[in-house]
């Protein structure tokens, strides 16, 4: 649930940073930067509980 909320937040932020549709550059970088640690943390947490 938290991961989905953070992904949605990252998408919103990237769209705000990119109002003219240049999503491949700035928004892509922001999205990768925001989601990579979140996904790593979720994966580590899942591995710890499994």
UniProtKB/Swiss-Prot annotation:
Keywords, alphabetical: Plasmid
By what name is this protein known? Uncharacterized protein y4aK
Q: Which organism is it from?
A: Sinorhizobium fredii (strain NBRC 101917 / NGR234)
